[in-house]
């Protein structure tokens, strides 16, 4: 479990230099942070010349601090006519400043104020994990890894072209200069990757040399006579798992099958990277099946042990909010209602478990805090039976609006083939083909993404995906029925079910069932009755009024979710099951990266009831994998969603018959 992040304080030394009392050290030389960044890190890595003409360039930094190295690098990138197509800057920070602290310390950066203010505007809460921020139309991407370097560095999935080593002095911040850190840097280093640091201590140079860097001295900055520069040129040639290289696609064209939340998000993320996308869906428009309902809530999951689900949902929620904000800023109607979400336990025992999780995690109150029943009633008209977790960033949205905004943002890069069902897929001469009912080729591309939920199994049967369909029914209460209840919350409330604030016409929505997919897909009065029971449990003061509602008079929405055995989605490159099973004996001790994959075939499936949480993050993950970019989440979280994860389990346990 990650330790709670302790933000840094904006304190100045007697000389007016940002200072850390925690480490008793300053953040940069007295000669100036930007000048130090230019001499040590840009100059020491041969920048900007090293990125000239590259499609992408990846820098990994240890110690983000004030962000001066990032800002100086961004400024140099902007000023360089030979700049790389996309600049990725990945930085680890254990003690991030708050947004207000950054603004205070950036006040004197006259020439960099526009960049500094753009960084401050997107600055995340101090939440453990990865945070991806995009600038300059997505061509400059900052991935912040907030947490201990011992935890975060091994979880980075990236291939680095350059390293900035910028922790506090080794005598004061030993964990940033350990052999474990040097090994972690070598794991990420692409062939010939360069490294620079102001530190010139002998053990630093020796440690880098031991892991494969050729190390030399260079003139230092300010009061330091020397600094260290290096390039990754190990004597050994083979690495079991080499870091990803920039992908080389002969044609940047992808087929995406399925135009729900998953498929539309993938389409937009690929289009943002300059890809042409052919989007297929058998219905007459986007978001016509599971994503069709107009009442979806989103909030994070919280657990005392910070489980995979908790970490994934936290990262997914934060990324989705940023992605939707960018769509809204581009002029697209997203319709996000950030009213907040109150999650109450189903009973007192669950409420105590919530309190225990909150105390264990110690997350910022801007992300989650406790709200008493009294406060919920006074502030949000929510007559709940007990207090619960308040997620101020939570809310609700109509998924079709998200899908429409994403396709509008993709613009001319997408060719939408609605009303066109793909009957089969095939790989011919290095291209994936989408085939129609009569075997005709509807489209051909080097990359194909399956984003069509359970229907993917019809196109590509996989015995280790274990997807199943779960029915969900939502109940709508008319305005008069809501009025008769005598009160309705103005926030989302979740517990045994969930309810959403009233719509513009006064209606209320309550959900949702989670039943086996059996029989015709039609609304059932018995399920409406069950939803009313859920409503009574969440708002017990209105239970008598709820009991007066005849379920037979109600309407709503019914749909089918696709879920996996553990309710985590399938996102990533599709495994080659046949090839893996043929090599079962040799793969018994394999890792996910050892398994054979189907070239150019990817999945974004089984989002279940958390489509809002998974879709944007899953799309960014897929697009990053396709391009060979740093991943937007920790490697163990990507592994938790890998479409090959159950195949790997079967291979390890010998269950391949």
UniProtKB/Swiss-Prot annotation:
Keywords, sorted A to Z:
Cytoplasm, FAD, Flavoprotein, Methyltransferase, Multifunctional enzyme, Oxidoreductase, S-adenosyl-L-methionine, Transferase, tRNA processing
Q: What InterPro entries does the record tag this protein with? A: FAD-dep_OxRdtase, FAD/NAD-bd_sf, MnmC-like_methylTransf, SAM-dependent_MTases_sf, tRNA_MAMT_biosynth_bifunc_MnmC, tRNA_MNMC2, tRNA_S-uridine_synth_MnmC_C
Q: Any keyword Metal-binding?
A: no
Kindly list the GO CC terms recorded for this protein. cytoplasm
Show the catalytic activity.
Answer: 5-aminomethyl-2-thiouridine(34) in tRNA + S-adenosyl-L-methionine = 5-methylaminomethyl-2-thiouridine(34) in tRNA + S-adenosyl-L-homocysteine + H(+)
Where are the residues of the annotated region FAD-dependent cmnm(5)s(2)U34 oxidoreductase? Answer: 257-657
In short, the EC number is 2.1.1.61, 1.5.-.-
Q: Where is this region: tRNA (mnm(5)s(2)U34)-methyltransferase?
A: 1-233
Please name the SUPFAM superfamilies in this protein's record: FAD/NAD(P)-binding domain (SSF51905)
> Which subcellular locations apply to this protein?
Cytoplasm
Question: This protein's superkingdom?
Answer: Bacteria
Claim: Cell division is one of the keywords in the record: no
Q: Name one GO molecular function term.
A: tRNA (5-methylaminomethyl-2-thiouridylate)(34)-methyltransferase activity
Q: Name one GO biological process term.
A: methylation
Q: What are the names of the required cofactors?
A: FAD
What's this protein's family per the entry? Answer: In the N-terminal section; belongs to the methyltransferase superfamily. tRNA (mnm(5)s(2)U34)-methyltransferase family. In the C-terminal section; belongs to the DAO family.
NCBIfam families from the UniProt entry: MnmC_Cterm, PRK01747.1-2, PRK01747.1-4, tRNA_MNMC2
Q: Function, please?
A: Catalyzes the last two steps in the biosynthesis of 5-methylaminomethyl-2-thiouridine (mnm(5)s(2)U) at the wobble position (U34) in tRNA. Catalyzes the FAD-dependent demodification of cmnm(5)s(2)U34 to nm(5)s(2)U34, followed by the transfer of a methyl group from S-adenosyl-L-methionine to nm(5)s(2)U34, to form mnm(5)s(2)U34.
Q: What is this protein called?
A: tRNA 5-methylaminomethyl-2-thiouridine biosynthesis bifunctional protein MnmC
């Amino acid at each position: 479990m990650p330790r709670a992040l302790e933000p840094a304080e904006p304190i100045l030394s007697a000389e007016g230099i940002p200072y850390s009392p925690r480490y008793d050290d300053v953040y940069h030389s007295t000669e100036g942070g930007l000048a130090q960044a230019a001499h040590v890190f840009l100059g020491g890595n041969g920048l900007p010349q090293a990125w000239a003409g590259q499609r992408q360039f990846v820098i990994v930094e240890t110690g983000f601090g004030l962000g001066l190295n990032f800002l100086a690098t961004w400024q140099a990138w902007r000023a360089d006519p030979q700049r790389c197509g996309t600049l990725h800057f990945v930085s680890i920070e254990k003690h991030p400043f708050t947004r207000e602290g950054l603004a205070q310390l950036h006040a004197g950066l006259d020439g960099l104020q526009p960049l500094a203010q753009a960084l401050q505007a997107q600055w995340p809460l101090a939440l453990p994990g990865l945070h991806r921020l995009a600038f300059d139309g997505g061509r400059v991407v900052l991935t912040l890894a907030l947490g201990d370097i011992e935890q975060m560095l091994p979880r980075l999935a990236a291939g680095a072209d350059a390293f900035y080593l910028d922790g506090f002095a080794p005598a004061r911040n030993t964990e940033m200069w350990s052999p474990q850190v040097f090994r972690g840097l070598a794991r990420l280093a692409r062939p010939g990757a360069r490294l620079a640091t102001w530190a010139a201590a002998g053990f630093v140079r020796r440690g880098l040399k031991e892991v494969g860097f050729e190390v030399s001295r260079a003139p230092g900055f300010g009061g330091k006579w020397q600094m260290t520069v290096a390039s990754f040129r190990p004597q050994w040639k083979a690495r079991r798992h080499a870091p990803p290289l920039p992908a080389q696609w002969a044609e940047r064209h992808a087929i995406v099958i399925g135009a729900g939340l998953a498929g539309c998000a993938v389409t937009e993320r690929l289009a943002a990277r300059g890809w042409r996308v052919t989007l297929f869906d058998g219905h007459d428009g986007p978001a016509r099946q599971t994503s069709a309902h107009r009442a979806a809530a989103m909030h994070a999951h919280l657990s005392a042990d910070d489980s995979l689900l908790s970490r994934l949902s936290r990262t997914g929620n934060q990324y989705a909010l940023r992605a939707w904000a960018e769509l809204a800023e581009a002029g697209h109607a997203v319709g996000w209602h950030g009213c907040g979400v109150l999650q109450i336990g189903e009973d007192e025992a669950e409420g105590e478990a919530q309190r225990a999780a909150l105390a264990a995690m110690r997350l910022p109150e801007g992300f989650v805090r406790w709200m008493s029943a009294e406060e919920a009633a006074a502030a949000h008209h929510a007559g709940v039976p007990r207090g619960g977790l308040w997620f101020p960033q939570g809310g609700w949205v109509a998924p079709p609006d998200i899908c429409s905004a994403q396709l509008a943002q993709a613009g001319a890069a997408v060719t939408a083939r609605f009303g066109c069902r793909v009957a089969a897929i095939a790989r011919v001469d290095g291209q994936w083909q989408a085939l129609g009912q009569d075997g005709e080729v509807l489209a051909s591309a080097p990359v194909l993404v399956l984003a069509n939920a359970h229907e993917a199994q019809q196109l590509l049967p996989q015995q280790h995906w274990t997807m199943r369909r779960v029915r969900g029914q939502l109940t709508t209460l008319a305005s008069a029925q809501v009025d008769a209840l005598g009160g309705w919350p103005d926030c989302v409330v979740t517990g045994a079910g969930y309810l959403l604030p009233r719509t513009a016409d006064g209606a209320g929505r309550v959900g949702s069932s989670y039943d086996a997919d059996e029989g015709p897909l039609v609304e059932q009065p018995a399920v409406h009755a069950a939803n009313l029971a859920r409503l009574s449990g969440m708002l017990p003061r209105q239970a008598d009024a709820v009991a007066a509602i005849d379920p037979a008079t109600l309407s709503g929405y019914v749909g089918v979710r696709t879920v996996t055995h553990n309710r985590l989605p399938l996102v990533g490159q599709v495994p080659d099951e046949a090839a893996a099973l043929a090599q079962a004996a040799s793969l018994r001790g394999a890792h996910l990266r050892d398994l054979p994959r189907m070239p150019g075939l990817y999945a974004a499936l089984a989002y279940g009831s958390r489509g809002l949480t998974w879709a944007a993050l899953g799309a960014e993950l897929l697009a990053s994998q396709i391009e060979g970019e740093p991943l937007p989440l920790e490697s163990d979280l990507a592994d938790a969603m890998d479409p090959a994860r159950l195949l790997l389990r079967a291979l390890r346990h010998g269950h391949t018959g």
